[in-house]
Amino acid sequence: MQTLAENLTSQAISPTLEKLILTLANTSKEISHAVRHGALAGVLGATEQENVQGETQKKLDIITNDMLKDALKADGTVRGIASEEEDYVVEADANGEFLVCFDPLDGSSNIDINSLVGTIFSVLPAPAGELTEKSFLQAGHNQVAAGYVLYGPSTMLALTTGQGVQLFTLNPETNQFLLTNAAMAVSKDTGEFAINMSNQRFWEAPMQTYISDLLLGKIGPREKSFNMRWIAAMVGDVHRVLCRGGIFTYPTDNKNPEKPYKLRLMYEANPMAFLVEQAGGKASTGYETIMDIEPTAIHQRVAVILGSANEVDACLEYHGIDYSEEPAL
């Protein structure tokens, strides 16, 4: 089996991007070790701190954030860092070519119950000049790499550099990521959907109607039975979509009118959209393609609908948009 390093060389990407991806991968091995040790290392439970989103930070949120931040600052290829756990952007190397946005431990509320968690990352080109928040405000189409590491029964890395999506599995005996799927592909159709049903009464009318029709199954307008899945960690739900198709959505809701969206654009929606589109799926807010969004803040939130192309199209029809037709040239 090809190692991650061998695979990156075969992709003919720049040596600096290759170095950065290997740094992210190597740090994820350390995070995997910390996650596995859990209560044995005294790293479970919450702190008394909150992040910029007002969410209570788990001990491992802070530990994993510091691990990634320290590794990227020392890498030499990174100009700046944006993290879910940092209020502001963090400067790294003044000569760095890249900006890295990451969620160090997605699904951290699952940690204390020994369920799935992961790391999500996005790599952008660093513009010339002084590093500010504005440096990061680039549309998702500018990403040069994106991926996630899933800490489950196996530790897996899903990666794209714009040349499809490759899946690597960490060999615990050699501590190397080995290529186990050279071309992940999202099926066009699906019979599975993932959504937090407890928020149903707060959704917009198009999403309410769409989900209601799925639940009606064969006796409804879709004339097909669907199963619901929900892991409560985006990284786990998107991994399932990449492996066997499906649609994952965290839609607009009015539960808190000041925060109508849950997921963050820069380090959750954009990297996952890049992966899903590279695997043949689609990713939208319901009203626009996620990677077309021009960001206004590093912690900006958006609605997310992504997964199997035909099912995303079906959902978008409920929102009054038909993306199934290719634009005329």
UniProtKB/Swiss-Prot annotation:
Note on cofactor: Binds 2 magnesium ions per subunit.
EC number(s) on file: 3.1.3.11
Pathway(s) of this molecule: Carbohydrate biosynthesis; gluconeogenesis
GO molecular function: fructose 1,6-bisphosphate 1-phosphatase activity; magnesium ion binding
Annotated substrate binding sites: 106-109, 196, 262
Cofactor dependency: Mg(2+)
One of the record's GO cellular component terms: cytosol
Keyword Metal-binding: yes
Catalytic activities: beta-D-fructose 1,6-bisphosphate + H2O = beta-D-fructose 6-phosphate + phosphate
Main location: cytoplasm
Enzyme class, UniProt record, top EC level: hydrolase
GO biological process, one term: fructose 1,6-bisphosphate metabolic process
Residues involved in Mg(2+) 1 binding: 84, 103, 105
Chain sites annotated for binding Mg(2+) 2: 103, 106, 268
Family: Belongs to the FBPase class 1 family.
Designated name of the protein: Fructose-1,6-bisphosphatase class 1
Source species: Shewanella halifaxensis (strain HAW-EB4)
